[in-house]
Amino acid sequence: MAQEDTFKKIVSHCKEYGFVFPSSDIYDGLAAVYDYGQNGVELKNNIKQYWWQSMVLLHSNIVGIDSAIFMHPTIWKASGHVDAFNDPLIDNRDSKKRYRADVLIEDQIGKYEEKITKEVAKAAKKFGDNFDEAKFRDTNPRVLEHQKKCDELHERYAKAMEASDFAELRQIILDEGIVDPISGTKNWTEVRQFNLMFSTEMGASADASTKIYLRPETAQGIFVNFLNVQKTGRMKLPFGIAQIGKAFRNEIVARQFVFRMREFEQMEMQYFCQPGTEMEWFKYWKQHRLAWHEALGMGDENYRFHDHEKLAHYANAATDIEFHLPFGFKEVEGIHSRTNFDLSQHEKFSGKQIKYFDPERNENYTPYVIETSIGVDRMFLSVMCHSYTEEQLENGSSRIVLKLPESLAPIKCAVLPLVNKDGLPEKAQEIVNDLKFHFNTSIEAKDSIGKRYRRQDAIGTPFCVTVDGDTLNDNTVTLRYRDSMKQERVPIAKLREIIEDRVSITSLLKKIDEKN
């Protein structure tokens, strides 16, 4: 199945089964704005809980805050967002559509990479166990040609971005023959800058109002609270401050479902450390965050690091953790060494001293910062894309199953009375009433047992418990496993123990410790 077709099916599945809806749907929606449905919000909350506990529970020196979306406007001047938070935009004169020039070029680089991947996959299929991928990549003329073009384009693009050379970005687009996906033409305008922050007015009247911004990131709320947290928590370096919250960016090219939106949610942690130790902590957090992802069991081969060649104005090192989505490897998390830029800027613009007194060195200094920043929505999409599976069964039928990491599944257990009579629904409800205090449990009695299994498969429920006539006599039930469809008879008294051991967030946290 083509990757594009797979992605369309995943988007459709999300709406059909209550994961994601187009926002304002009865008004024909609002472009690139989505609402999370009853199953989507549970999955999203489980992702956030997993992240929060991995930060705050596993690290005694990391605490959390929840800062305001509206902040003093000078904060964004100090952080550089007012002057430097821009995207290079280009318009197609025929379609009247606007695009990010850098994204058009990155997509072109991705096309070269995809050609190489297809050549490798074709050869692997042809030669089987005797296939030497490394040798094939080093010797195959077509692969070498695609790789040469990819490397040359990447080098040229990186130089243009580093120099903010908009004329060169446009020339790259023209030289590569990049066409507008709607009009199919190359009739491009010049490239220009566009600030990504949403602004609004705060005040009782237009004359007395103050221009403020919807925050484009949650990080600045952490930086301006550094002293508040450090002093009230009696925190000693190194320590971290974690936060989960909404951020807003006026993306011109919002696309690929929930991957790139104008309203999104971030999970960020700023780790404050002694100057000179930042690269040691940068390395630590790279590996620790990768372990967090890999503990989900979505295939270590689906992750890779992408080190930045062009660094943001605040960073001295940066890398992305990328995940293999249907449209290529894309960033799901960034790890950055932000130096002391942010704290120094806020000290300068606020006129307040933002220093840490180190009792061991008997001196004041501005801490350096390592940031980990992950998009909740991108993580949600990664989990959905990896989990969506179409299976052909031995009996000739098929099923769609979401093989979600069990700890993240919206519903952990569905209790299904075999028939909706003879005291079975009442017995099923008794089981639900016992299990619901430990993990999310539902009851479903409508339709045949086979159809109910398929519905639970489609929303990723790891366990189904079938209550039948024998249950009333011996207090045993049939426990069905989602991925294998294996069924076994178990006592009701053991249900909680069997299921909880596999679906708790604790089981994931232990895997992180094992990987570290």
Label the predicted regions.
Residues 1-516:
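NTP/phosphate- and nucleic-acid-binding module
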